[in-house]
Structures are given as C-alpha cells and as structure tokens.
C-alpha cells in the first residue's frame, strides 16, 4: 500500500498523487509498488530492501552519489494471542530522506505512523524532513514507554498469581514477558545509538529549532 500526505492549513492531508514536499508512506508494498518507489520516486533499491527486512537492525545509511539517507529504527508492536496472553515484539521501519520527499517504508502498520497520519503531531510539516523524522522517533519512543508499562503491569499480575498457584501457563506467560523486555531493551539501545549518530552526523541537517525536539526524544528513550 502506498499513501501520500502533505501538510496544509488544515493539517495533515492525504493527497492522490505524490508531489514535491510530501510524505510517502509505504506499508507492505507490492512488487509493483516497490518498482514505483525506485523508478518513479527514485528511492534506492537497497534502501527499500533494507526497510522491508525483518532482521534489519537500527542504523543510519547514506548514499553520497544520490544524496539519500536511510534511517532504520525499531518500533514496538504487539500480538494479542488470547484474552490473557499478549506477545510483544519489535519491527524495523525505514525512513528515507531524499530530494523532494520523505518516505517511510515498513512491513506492518505502526502506532507512530498512524499518529502522524491522524494529525496528532503539532507543528509538523512534511517539507521539514528532519523535524518529521524526530517527531516520528518521539512517537516511537513514547509507544515503547507505554508498552513497557503494560509489560510491567502484566508481569506483576502474573507473578502474584504464581505465588498463589504455580502453573505452567503462568510460567510460560512470565517467560514470554521477560523475552519481550529483552527485545525492547536491545531495540531501545540500538535506536538510541542511531539517534546519537543523527545528531553527530552530517547526512541529516539538524537545525537549531530542532534541538529541543531531539532532546525530548533522547529523554524518552532513556
């Protein structure tokens, strides 16, 4: 699926076709849509491939020849197995910053992307690519925090039940939650390293007015 958005006086607005200064959002793009991204928009093929690789870790990549930057970050997700069991995991999300566009590419929908589409970010402008990226990272870090609080709540609840009655189902649930914590801890450390590279690097121009937002993201990730 390919979607196109652009900010206007009314906020975040979906548009029918890509145009300069817009945000292109690709979720589980088909082969035809991938070709459109590479041939019509000009996104590097390896950037599209990396963004859709579930094993890809958080990092920053820059292509000097085409002046394109790829930022891969991990974002939290969950799968509700049944009423008592929830599985938490992380997925990669690619953000391509290039001439004329900012492009997000992922295999699955994410809370952060949906929040941007729904206009929940104040003062966002699709033409301001650095601010767009940092706002997305802020939403992702806030989602991590929400999930961590829920994991803590479920862990405490499960431990309390196990103290009263030891059972295999409860033990498996607790192990799954601990596994989720390990995933999240690893992903947050990787995202934090990527955030520091963004701040130190020259590939993404960090404007003075973006410094406060960058600091907000750092605080949330810590």
Feature names for model-found ranges:
Residues 1-220:
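Peripheral, non-transmembrane regulatory/ligand-interaction domains of membrane transport proteins
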